[in-house]
Amino acid sequence: MAAYKLVLIRHGESTWNLENRFSCWYDADLSPAGHEEAKRGGQALRDAGYEFDICLTSVQKRVIRTLWTVLDAIDQMWLPVVRTWRLNERHYGGLTALNKAETAAKHGEAQVKIWRRSYDVPPPPMEPDHPFYSNISKDRRYADLTEDQLPSYESPKDTIARALPFWNEEIVPQIKEGKRVLIAAHGNSLQGIAKHVEGLSEEAIMELNLPTGIPIVYELDKNLKPIKPMQFLGDEETVCKAMEAVAAQGKAKK
């Protein structure tokens, strides 16, 4: 029998997801379709009778708005919310704002897959002459970060390394206190949590395509280890299509 339950949800489609661009730390909002995804995710949680005690999320609006939409759907908008940059999306450095398919056509799908799917290979850094450099690095929400904390690029390994301290120091104690926790975040930061919880290999985590807007449920034992694989609150066809869409983002258009 599970000692705890943990629910994760990846933000709905953003405007830059719609345009197939590397979103990174740019603060893209939800697209209309992404808002509908979040509403459906919230309705799935409502239909399943989920209640929560605390929510944790990033400082990026696409996931904050996803969380708002979910909380509205389950009529729990009063819940406390902890926001942290440590749950932000991976920083894609110099690839930020580039169209993924066009980048694949230019550099080859193999190179884009290395940038997107290699565990410890970072993309090119975001240089000061990048059009979104100031937009991100000078944003006041990051004013308290040290130079070492504010990245100019990240590999998935780097993203996981900055998310895990928050998991260990903030999330784990809440779960062990018996609080029902909802984490709304991004693909790469949620991959980091999944890798840690399930003990997945570097290769396995990079092939994990988490769908947007579909709640993910873990049933955990007293040591916070899963007693069964992650479960998706959605019909199988919808989940598979959503995962396939994520996997196809780095491919050149035919």
UniProtKB/Swiss-Prot annotation:
Phosphotyrosine modified-residue sites: Y26
GN (gene name): PGAM4
UniProt record similarity statement: Belongs to the phosphoglycerate mutase family. BPG-dependent PGAM subfamily.
Keywords, ordered alphabetically: Acetylation, Glycolysis, Hydrolase, Isomerase, Phosphoprotein
Species this chain originates from: Pan troglodytes (Chimpanzee)
Biological process, per Gene Ontology: glycolytic process
Top-rank EC class of the record's enzyme: isomerase
Gene3D superfamilies: Phosphoglycerate mutase-like (3.40.50.1240)
Lineage, uppermost ranks: Eukaryota, Metazoa, Chordata, Craniata, Vertebrata
Residue numbers of N6-acetyllysine PTMs: K106, K251, K253, K254
Name used for this protein in its record: Probable phosphoglycerate mutase 4
